Swiss-Prot record:
The lineage of its organism: Bacteria, Pseudomonadati, Pseudomonadota, Gammaproteobacteria, Alteromonadales. This is Ribosomal RNA large subunit methyltransferase G. The gene is rlmG. Its EC number is 2.1.1.174. One of its GO terms (molecular function) is 23S rRNA (guanine(1835)-N(2))-methyltransferase activity. Specifically methylates the guanine in position 1835 (m2G1835) of 23S rRNA. Its main location: cytoplasm. It comes from Alteromonas mediterranea (strain DSM 17117 / CIP 110805 / LMG 28347 / Deep ecotype). Belongs to the methyltransferase superfamily. RlmG family.
Amino acid sequence: MNTEFIFADRQLSLIRYPEKHQHVSLQAWDSADELVIEHLESLLSENELSIGDNESTPSLMIFNDDFGALGCWFSHLAPYWVSDSYISLRSLHENLKANSLIRASEGSCTQELKTSPVKTLTSVESASFKPACAPAVVVIKVPRALALLEQQLIDLQAYITPETQVIATGKVKAITKSALNLFEKYIGPTTTSLAKKKSRLIFATPRDSLKQATSPYPTRWQCKSTMGAALIIDNLANTFARQSLDIGARIMLEHMTVSANDVVVDLGCGNGVLGVNALSLAPDAKVIFVDESYMALESARLNVLNNFPDKIEQCEFVASNCLETLLNRENKPAVTKILCNPPFHQQNAITDHIAWQMFTDSRDLLVKSGHLVVVGNRHLEYHIKLKKLFGGAKVLASDKKFVILGTAKR
């Protein structure tokens, strides 16, 4: 992996977290980062921007910084940094440390980030956030999910002014007509830059007297549990399968089994439908919902409250890179069953390292004879990975496209 970001006479060491699992061809920044850095540095050098470094002066806000490149570059401006991704947060943390922009200690990521000039907010926290002073500049890395962009623009309506410069950056293929329409709808007149290295900037000018729109999120739909009862499922903007039950989860619901005393992990939980279904099957089970998306975890929490509010104390909601957070605990939970529908994207890159790490972490966390149950497309051939790690896997159910595999820790 290329880790040396050399640009405009500066050099930063930047990694994609978790570094040890990344393909050598990947790096922690792209041309969209370079383009917005170049633009802002030009404005700063010509004194066309006035950005303060304390809460009572106009600030810089950064949204969706994939691996912390923008947060590190502009750390001297004490920006607010907003992300829905735990992995992005960990990347920012590691990169701030690598470039001596944060005090290293024996503390946790959260504790060390408190010493950083970069003020971090999760996407869930940012929904109710309002700075003391309107930001001078808002930089948005256009996300894959336009619903997330829509929610962020609605949130911004609460505190930006016509003097705020709203600048988005992204690959040309990400800057679609639909994305531009969102800026026009929620912010104001919108233009774009010329393309450079397959990236482009968006410039949106806030209208006078912006009124905050009503958010269309969370979206709500219903599905049937394994026992046939209706489950009410809410989905915040950046939640996988936001509009309907995905096919893999549907097959899992048809074939799930959970025992009364199980400690269940819903790994990569999304809206938590599998974990909520586990509570319907075994009301006394403990369920740990794990995801790297803060909106997913909040959706899962809402869905426990929607369907089994008296079981909320049996549930835990953990932001983590796969099962890393649980494995690093001094007192690890005695997990007997892990339910997993692995993703195969990290930000905009297609990768199989997430599935590998999920399976490896599951092997390490499960108690002896504990079970991992995986659903996935047939062509992903998860049975090969599971055989290497667990010694084999059994087909529990299948259709033309999907397969459910089960394996046990020996």
